[in-house]
Amino acid sequence: MGTVRDWLVLFRAGNCITGFVGVFLGAILTLEDLPTGDNLNITTLLALSVYSFMASWNALNDYLDFEIDKINRPDRPLPSGRINKTVAMTAIITGCIISFGSLFLAGQIANDMTNNFEDWYPTIVIWLLALVLLLNYEDDRVLLGLKNRGLPGNLAISISVGLVVLFGAAGIFDPLNERAVSLFVIGTLYNLSREIIKDVEDMDGDKGRNTYAMRVGADKARLTSWVILLITLVALLTPFAMGIFELLHIIFIAPGLFTLMSVKKHIYLAEDTAASRMIKIAMTLTMVGLILAALM
């Protein structure tokens, strides 16, 4: 059956928590306040939907990579035998059911709040879009198999991560809220840069996979990652320049900006693990800064 730690590793619980929080970020940015009442209930259910969805996605990824991980990552819960494949598949299916069930319950609450439930349809569309991305990322027999197509696979993962913010905004009937859309773009770019660096970091274990780093080489992949970070910098400053956030509140994202710029040194020195870690820190600091900018 595996220990609790084994299941947390299989589900990549840390990433799931990030998705859970991302839904709340979308709601907070949209409301410019903390959600309460029915908005809080909807946001919590959607966050649970994202958590269970991401847990299923991550576990399915390991399930499908079972043979590869027996060689490259024999310490993982599935190839090591600590978690049985059949039990893992049951957990994957259960996670999908919980995700859909949470979405359904949130929809019931939303339906009671409005006379025009069509305004809540984007929430369902975003959930379905994430499902389509998952299926096309993993399946290379019938669908696109983006996982082994290099940059498109990185982009699919990054968009799916960014979508959780729009999911939170859509849950309270405002999927195209300018502040939420800004964070969606910024988060997608941050994640895309980090995904590329992680591919460079994993090149030794990715032999036989068609990742972007394996296609173009480590140096070009690092350069691409840095260029995307520079685009992220522009995306960070744009909503302040456009008045979406108060210009004076740019001080709140300063720690994220400085951390972002510090990544260049690690990329230049080919310190991929450090670069990946700093990008994640920069992204976290930026999210905190944008929340403060929205609440002030």
Positions of predicted regions on the chain:
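Extended hydrophobic alpha-helices typical of membrane-associated regions
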Residues: 2-5, 16, 22, 142-145, ...
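Intramembrane alpha-helical segments
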Residues: 2-9, 78-176
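Select subsegments of transmembrane alpha-helices in polytopic membrane proteins
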Residues: 9-20, 84-94, 152-159, 219-228, ...
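Residues within membrane-spanning alpha-helices of integral membrane proteins
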Residues: 16, 47, 93-96, 124-127, ...
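Membrane-embedded alpha-helical segments that form the functional core of polytopic membrane enzymes
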Residues: 17-64, 96-104, 120-133, 176-197
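Structural signal for membrane-spanning alpha-helices in multi-pass inner-membrane proteins
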Residues: 23-30, 99-107, 134-141, 164-172, ...
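Functional transmembrane core segments of multi-pass inner-membrane proteins
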Residues: 30-45, 155-203, 219-236
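Solvent-exposed interhelical
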Residues: 49-100, 188-236, 266
